[in-house]
Amino acid sequence: IAVVHAPGSNSDSVAEHAMMLILGAIKNVVVVDRLTRKSDWSEARWRGNFEVKGKTLGIIGVGNIGRRVARMAAAFGMRVIGYDPYLPAAELTARGAEPMPSLAALLGQADVITCHTPHTPGTHHMIDAAAVGRMKDGVVFVNTSRGKVQDEAALLAGLKSGKIARAGLDVFEEEPISSDSELLHQDNVIVTSHLAGVTGESMRAMALQVTGEMLRLLRGERPHVVANPDVHVTLTHLVPATR
């Protein structure tokens, strides 16, 4: 049985959400909103708001989503650097990111770090205590990829110490995140419920993409994207897709 899927159908939605978390964290939106509602006007105006322009954004994983974030960040006047072990330097440059030779190099230069990488044995707890230690003081950290890429104990320690000034998290090691998680009680963390890719537009695009693959099979054509490559040998009788 061929299993088809819809890669890239929610890339714009996730990239926009990542950029929203970046801006929200830099502008300290959640804290300022809370203080303004309490009529603490003066305090709200001096809660560490700073500019995006001129800051260095480090993108970990410059795929479908990362390249879109790079384009958005450049429009805000950010310097964009990227690390992706699966892409050559020339391709990273073409995708709008200055290539970094290693994760450590990126961590040491970025004012803002955003993760766009799958969870694999190689990326499990990639953002651990050692990685946090390599970051610049006062960094902003954003993750809209997979929760287990981050070691939340190390992340929490960094947030409490001020090493990580602010964070925007759409994903967590365990989901739903427990209501007693300390991350939920940090003023310098914006949290959302793994919804970056869930928009009306992305759901429609996903449905249309999968339906198109099903129709190709019914027409006797090979689908464009098959999730289980072991069935490819059983699809050789199908003709290449015409559309």
Placement of each model-derived feature along the sequence:
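Glycine-rich Rossmann-fold phosphate-binding loop(s) that bind the pyrophosphate
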Residues: 62-63
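N-terminal Rossmann-fold NAD(P) dinucleotide-binding loop
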Residues: 66-67
